[in-house]
């Protein structure tokens, strides 16, 4: 017989990491600080079940999307040095495939120079949750992108922006 390829099939052991991504972006044209949170829909539904008391959450329902948006709003903050947390306006949420997006924004005259960030999203539900916050304050210039990560018992982290 000729040389063949033997392929063994093993049960899939892949496990999706518990992670969320937030993008904080300065929109210079609109003078807006825009915040976009991206969560895995299943993880968000578990959070709604455990933290909001919804027996069977369904993120295709607008009511459950609104409750998730309020959950996210309560667990994420941006605070300028020596100031109070920014009053981010909650815009809403939308489901796209396996992910749910929550949107916030705030009108400002100029982008902040520095921020203290707290990100407890899903960290009260999953012990191994890892949250990444990316900051784009310079129109997408990769040299000016800043990143913070939150896991375990992390509290506020600080970030500064150079232009």
Residue ranges and their predicted role:
Residues 1-2:
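N-terminal export leaders
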Residues 7, 12-14:
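Boundary at the C-terminal end of the N-terminal hydrophobic targeting segment
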Residues 14-163:
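N-terminal soluble domains immediately following signal/targeting peptides that reside
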């Amino acid at each position: 017989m000729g040389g063949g390829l033997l392929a063994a099939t093993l049960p899939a052991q892949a496990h999706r990491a518990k992670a969320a991504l937030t993008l904080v972006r300065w929109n210079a044209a609109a003078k807006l600080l825009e915040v976009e949170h991206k969560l895995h829909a299943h993880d968000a539904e578990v959070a709604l079940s455990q933290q909001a008391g919804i027996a069977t959450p369904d993120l295709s329902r607008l009511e459950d999307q609104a409750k998730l948006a309020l959950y996210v709003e309560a667990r994420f903050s941006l605070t300028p040095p020596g100031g109070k947390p920014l009053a981010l306006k909650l815009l809403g949420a939308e489901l796209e495939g396996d992910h749910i997006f929550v949107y916030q924004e705030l009108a400002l005259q100029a982008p902040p120079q520095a921020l203290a960030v707290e990100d407890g999203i899903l960290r009260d539900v999953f012990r191994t949750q890892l949250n990444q916050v990316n900051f784009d304050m310079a129109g997408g210039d990769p040299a000016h992108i800043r990143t913070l990560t939150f896991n375990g018992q992390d509290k506020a982290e600080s970030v500064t922006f150079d232009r």
